[in-house]
């Protein structure tokens, strides 16, 4: 893997990649918003905000692409103040004061409004940058991970709300001028925990609370189409649910035994189940088990092929949450479960079999497929403080179907503690997969090579230099934003 130099960033926003993949934004301690071209990594846009405000910033969010219009606005926000900056119209900016009602979260709508979540009340403020006005969406459910769902192709949003002791779905037509409530329907749920549109926009899945194993499927018109309950006895419900990229499968993650139920999306009947268990062995030629090994004296970490899964994991709890990620063409899926938090399971969805198991030394905190290459996945693990591996050895793990073995890659910078990773969208300018790796106060861009012998990065190349940044700031126009 080839690494670029280090570029300045701040915790907890780190670096933010635009949806179009053209820009990488980060913050500096001096109050600068630094925006680089993701291809050349040259500094193209610089905004100067109040340095004290920058130290409080917790959100750095690019506006999504609106049709043919590429993303050109970015939201920089703390819990009590929001700025919107524009890299095309440098003299434009917007600020929203929220100190009377601090934010618990913030996001963009598909039509370009800001959704501001209140810390004090169950409401969302929809803020229009065009009209410079905000309006409230009341009775929004709190403490729910998927409380709203944006339709993938039409300009409307579904909100999960609760009032008078009942769950409701609210369908809003969204535009740059206003959000109009089109329809409201009462749900049969006791306490719904999430909603999610299918990729084709025809179906809306509504998940019941974890004590009841049921999922309701609504048509886009708001009519209840199907109610799925497993045929076998399940003492508790589902911890999560996910659609595959093209909508072929709806996956339900059982909280009872960490089994994943895959439903086909014509009749919403069960197709097959993915079982997380320790009985698999690699005696089958199609099955591969790799375990991470550490060599302290050589300061290396590698994967070794093993005959069977370890059985010395801590005794799992009765209930286990699971997560699933599909690759971009729906041929493979990666899963983890809190039952065995050190293990990543890779499933071949074409023959409905387990293909590969990766056993890590530490708990997996993040895993994601490459957005354009269907056989490549990255894994990030939590490094324990009591680990004997030197502090410079913070690693990322990669698996690709075309490789002979999985790979362990360490950032060649002493003390670089990986906090966040993000794939770059495939680009016509680069045939190699590209990933942004963020540390606590800097980030680097890494390029994956097929042959590890072709990769070479000097440690001196990854030393962050304030002098280099100062020179870049001198040659790049800085736009000062009033505080």
UniProtKB/Swiss-Prot annotation:
Keyword Cell inner membrane: no
Annotated disulfide bonds: none
Per-repeat ranges for WD: 96-137
Cited Gene3D superfamilies: YVTN repeat-like/Quinoprotein amine dehydrogenase (2.130.10.10)
Pfam families: WD40
GO cellular component, as recorded: cytosol; microtubule organizing center; mitotic spindle; mitotic spindle pole body; MWP complex; nucleus
GO BP field: microtubule anchoring at mitotic spindle pole body; mitotic sister chromatid segregation
Protein name per Swiss-Prot or TrEMBL: Uncharacterized WD repeat-containing protein C32H8.09
Organism: Schizosaccharomyces pombe (strain 972 / ATCC 24843) (Fission yeast)
